[in-house]
Amino acid sequence: MTTLCLNMIVKNESKIILRLFDSVVNIIDCYCICDTGSTDNTVELIKTYFENKNIPGKIVNEPFKNFCHNRNFSIRSCLGMSDYILLLDADMLLQIYNFDKNTLRNFDSFYILQGNDNFYYQNTRIVRNNGLYSYVGVTHEYLNTPSNNKTGLINKTELFILDIGDGGSKQNKFE
């Protein structure tokens, strides 16, 4: 069976993070979340939620430097935990329809449609957990893929990322 690790960077997301977890709990096998300096109870919520669901994982701490640095730190921290990594943010909701994780084996990375009812676009949100993927760019970061990467598209009838945009640290995004 193909395994999937939830991977994120978070800071002060206690008001919304459980909503995301509830949306992914049925397809993830583990989690690796990088906290960049939460001062609320985000870390405690993460631990308690996944302990109650018997989902293994870890929280790593790395002070926020920039999105590229922290996302790469987070990805490196989950190396060896799963076959694939699911890259999400706390202010998203993963809508799962007709999705079989075992189909992931056919490709190295996957576009998932992301957005809202009026506008959506393809974004690489699942990658093979092999240490070959990294982010580039300080603020408007993008995923750098290996030259021999085979990318698949997950149809909107299988998965869709609803980008709600109400993250807890939007107001102090660069602190």
Protein language model annotation of sequence segments:
Residues 7-30:
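Short, well-formed alpha-helical segments that are part of the catalytic scaffolds
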Residues 44-73, 77:
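Conserved donor nucleotide-binding strand/loop of the catalytic core
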Residues 67-76, 82-88, 92-175:
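Catalytic-site signature of metal-activated, phosphate-bearing donor transferases
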Residues 8, 29-37, 58-62:
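Short beta-strand/loop segment that forms part of the nucleotide-sugar
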Residues 15-18, 40, 44, 69:
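Residue-level preference for short helical/loop micro-motifs built around acidic side chains
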Residues 23, 33-46, 63-64:
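A conserved acidic beta->alpha catalytic loop
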Residues 3-5:
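Cell-envelope/extracellular polymer assembly enzymes that use nucleotide-activated donors
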Residues 21-25, 32, 47, 75, ...:
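A structural alpha-helix within SAM-dependent methyltransferase catalytic domains
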